[in-house]
Amino acid sequence: MATNQSIKNNIQKKQKNVPVQQQGATMKGLLSSPSVIKRFEEVLGKRATQFTASILSLYNSEQMLQKTDPMSVISSAMVAATLDLPIDKNLGYAWIVPYGGKAQFQLGYKGYIQLALRTGQYKSINCIPIHEGELQKWNPLTEEIEIDFEKRESDAVIGYAAYFELINGFRKTVYWTKAQVEKHKKKFSKSDFGWKNDWDAMALKTVLKAVLSKWGILSVEMQKAVIEEDETRERIDITNEADSSEIIDSEPSNKDETEKPSAQETDPFDGKPVDIKDDELPFD
């Protein structure tokens, strides 16, 4: 029986010269492992099949991800699964990103908004870039902000504003200049990878995370997400969401947590499963 360590050693030894198709087959085998399937089914129920298929699709489409430890990809995906967030990079809720030979979980600002809305405590929440000429007044003490979008002078972004209002009436507004965001970036982000990819999305996430973690109501899953972000922030930080400036009003969702997977469900992968013991998995 192959051990998790022997699998990883073999993969790392050959990975540089392994064709993409063969690397995909390796990930396919890991995802077909009964132990891995069982863990995802315990978290996602009947949606586990679709989620693990999305892991394989992401892995096969990202050459940089194929250079990382495959088990770290699965471990990062499990974090997203426990938060019930999709890992499709086009959606921008959660990311699995490569850094230093390993994959890491990262949360997009849309992911923060989604987790906030699930609490049922937020009446509205939003985060937008402020362009040159739009900001008329900002008082950081009273949080009075005046924005006139009709007075935009150019497409140059001068800052970022985040706002939320709870159903009990408590509200919070934060505005950071671009210089403040840049200072925060230099202090906490050890990699420019995400910032080079989409500076505005990273800035929006930074400001929104700051206001939610300090003033917002955090559910257990939101606290978990913040912890995961803090643990990886010094290594890499990335989002790549499409720009969205509309105010989002929450409707408490009822997520069905009673669904359990059928034992007769068809394995979505035709690769040979890798035999892994439960105690060899990279997650609890």
Curated annotation (Swiss-Prot):
Q: Enumerate the residue ranges of region (Disordered).
A: 236-284
Q: What ranges does the record list as Basic and acidic residues composition bias? A: 252-262, 269-284
* Gene Ontology MF terms in the entry: DNA binding
Q: Could you list the residue ranges forming a coiled coil in this record?
A: none
| InterPro entries reported for this sequence | RecT_fam, ssDNA_annealing_RecT
Q: Name one GO biological process term.
A: DNA metabolic process
Superkingdom, natural source:
Bacteria
User: Pfam families, from UniProt?
Assistant: RecT
- By what name is this protein known? Uncharacterized protein YqaK
What's the source species' lineage?
Bacteria, Bacillati, Bacillota, Bacilli, Bacillales
